[in-house]
Amino acid sequence: MREIYFGIASYRRPDNQRTLDYLERMGIDREHIIMSVQSAEDKAQYERAGIGNRVGRLIYRPGKNVSDNRNTLLESVPPGTRLVMLDDDINAVCKLDGKGLRKIESREEFYSMLKRGYALAARHRTVGFGLYPVKNAYFMSTGYAERNVVIGTLFAIVNTDLRFDAEMATKEDYEYCCKAMRRYGAFVRLNGYVCDAQHYTKGGCEEAWNDKAELFRTARRLAGKYPDILTLNPKRPGEVKMAGKRGGKRK
């Protein structure tokens, strides 16, 4: 199997790197970890905090949002590279185990999940996969969805010319999935795995998520641009859901 690289898009969290801590606990090779920040101030603070000594590359390119930060990661690796993009606030990845969830703590089990995801993406001739969005075992299953949007907490892709929309400060992950589905017909979601993460906490992108007006505009934009894939969610204002039947849930 080709080597896998890990890209962490980080913002204003030099002293609170949960995802990096998690990768280190599992024994992930630091040379395979890339961290991207989007301001010179962040770059200096992260260097002072010693982050540069914990990753293979600490890179910086000016950016205004998480889309720019993710695109910096994509531009840092050659086409065809397997890149697992991660938010910086992940405590652990969890696996459905019976009626509950169990944290993945070993490198071997973590890579087993990644290998399965990449194999399914290749089977369906698409560029990537993600995990179940909500940490609730009741709604999860051991199967997968062939065609679904996924959240960017863990977003594993093969690098192509596809990029995140730099005008989107939120739901940029959904928009990328829609572009991939338009081009390839699929984007895989593993329904038996989910991230335990500290979403919407200080640092990161909490400012963008607190802008409710922008969330509504983004949802309308996505539903208007990809009406064959997404529709507004009437039960959750400011959110979207898959339009029509969801694609191909499989074991």
Enumerate the predicted regions with their spans.
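Active-site-proximal specificity loops/subdomain of glycosyltransferases
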Residues: S36-L86, N91-S106
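Short, well-formed alpha-helical segments that are part of the catalytic scaffolds
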Residues: I8-I28, E41-A49
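Short, solvent-exposed loop/turn segments at secondary-structure junctions
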Residues: Y11-R13, N65, D89-N91, V134-A137, ...
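Hydrophobic targeting segments
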Residues: R2-I8, L23, E31-M35
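Conserved catalytic core of nucleotide-sugar-dependent glycosyltransferases
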Residues: V93-C178
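C-terminal catalytic/acceptor-binding lobe
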Residues: M1-I4, R12-R18, M168-A169, Y174-K251
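A structural signal for short, well-ordered beta-strand segments and their strand-loop junctions
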Residues: R82-D87, V127-Y132, F187-N191, T231-P234
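A short acidic (Asp/Glu
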Residues: Q17-L20, A44-E47, C94-D97, F139-A145, ...
